């Protein structure tokens, strides 16, 4: 139940758990990512309590971690530690001046053409004319203005404090991969579907690799 989840989280994170959902805390990606992990596991366990047992799990980006927990591939305590590290590595690499911007109403070739010469990356391919770019604030603002002039219906800076799903996170992803060496992953009880490759993974090492690269790979019409 809810209290059992929070008790398990406090055993790893201490009193931080009680302030994660505050407005101040949610300005930082650590709180956002931990909240998404805890909420994802809590809701899935509630469904299990009601008799809903999954045959397959999947998650987009940070959602892959609660998916792995529910599949039995990764224990909740390890997931908490790894997600906290994931967030810290991202924020330490880019403490300010970087993030994400959504662009709607233009096709992919058009968006990619506007990105040329700017320090930005295509991070999310959500639909045929809906994309998210990652990079420096100034560079994203320039591309956003170009997009609006080119006929985009919307170009909006997202409330995200770090860049995601792009090559800017090569080093944090490598550090996170090293941390997985100390985590014990198991063969999942049900199918684990990679949100990045749309392939079912059963091998614990392949699942670990998939989780480690969730912050790095662009998401293309996420499954």
Identify what each model region corresponds to.
Residues 1-58, 133:
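Helix-rich "cap/lid" substructures immediately adjacent to catalytic or cofactor-binding pockets
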Residues 3, 10-11, 15, 71-218:
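Alpha/beta catalytic cores of group-transfer enzymes, especially the acyltransferase/condensing modules
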Residues 19-26, 66, 154-158:
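A short small-residue
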Residues 23-25, 58-62, 87, 98-102:
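Short, glycine/charge-rich beta-strand/loop segments that flank catalytic centers
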Residues 25-29, 68, 210:
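A short, mixed-charge helix-start or loop-turn motif at secondary-structure junctions
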Residues 40, 55, 59-63, 67, ...:
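Gly/Ala-rich beta-loop-alpha elbow adjacent to hydrolase catalytic centers
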Residues 51, 61, 184:
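Conserved functional loop/turn residues at catalytic and ligand-binding sites
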Residues 219-223:
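A short, well-structured juxtamembrane/interface segment
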